[in-house]
C-alpha cells in the first residue's frame, strides 16, 4: 500500500510540474543574429590608394558581405595610435595615407563614409580601436 501511495504522489507531482511548465515562444529569441565581419586596416591594403578607388573597394566589400548575410561591420578605425577618422586628438593613420599625421587628399572621413554606407544597407557599424598599440613595426615613424 505504501508503494502505491508513493507512486500516486510521484505521479501527481509529475503532472503538476507539467501544468506549470512554460512554453517557449518565438518572441523569447532575439529578432536576428549578430553576423559580423571585421574589416581591418593594418595590412596596408588601403595605403596610398586614391580616395575614389578606396571608396569603391570598401563599397564592393560591403556589397559582397551583405549578399553573404552579414548584418554588422566591425571596421578598424584606430590601428596604431592614429585614426581613420577626423580627430582633434589622434593623427591620421599611415595605413590610409602612407604617412602618419597626413590628412587624406581629397579630404574625407573613412569612418563616417563606412557608417553611411553600412546604414544604406541596413547593416550595423561598429568601430574597432586598438587602445594600446602604438606601432606594428620598429621602422615606422610616429607623427
Where is each model-derived feature located?
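Bacterial N-terminal signal peptides that target proteins for export
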Residues: 1-7
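Boundary at the C-terminal end of the N-terminal hydrophobic targeting segment
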Residues: 19-23
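Active-site-adjacent "subsite" loops/lids of carbohydrate-active enzymes
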Residues: 32-34, 38-40, 44-56, 116, ...
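Catalytic domains of carbohydrate-active enzymes, especially glycoside hydrolases
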Residues: 56-83
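Aromatic- and acidic-residue-enriched segments that line the glycan-binding/catalytic groove
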Residues: 83-98, 133-143
Amino acid at each position: 500500500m505504501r508503494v502505491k501511495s508513493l507512486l500516486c504522489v510521484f505521479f501527481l507531482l509529475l503532472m503538476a510540474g507539467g501544468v506549470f511548465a512554460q512554453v517557449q515562444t518565438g518572441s523569447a529569441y532575439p529578432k536576428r543574429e549578430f553576423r559580423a565581419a571585421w574589416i581591418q586596416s593594418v595590412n596596408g591594403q588601403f595605403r596610398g590608394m586614391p580616395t575614389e578607388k578606396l571608396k569603391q573597394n570598401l563599397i564592393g566589400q560591403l556589397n559582397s558581405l551583405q549578399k553573404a548575410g552579414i548584418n554588422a561591420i566591425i571596421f578598424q578605425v584606430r590601428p596604431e595610435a592614429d585614426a581613420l577618422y577626423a580627430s582633434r586628438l589622434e593623427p591620421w593613420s599611415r595605413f590610409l595615407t602612407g604617412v602618419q599625421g597626413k590628412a587624406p587628399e581629397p579630404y574625407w572621413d573613412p569612418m563616417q563614409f563606412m557608417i553611411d554606407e553600412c546604414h544604406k544597407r541596413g547593416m550595423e557599424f561598429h568601430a574597432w580601436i586598438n587602445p594600446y598599440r602604438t606601432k606594428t613595426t620598429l621602422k615606422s615613424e610616429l607623427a
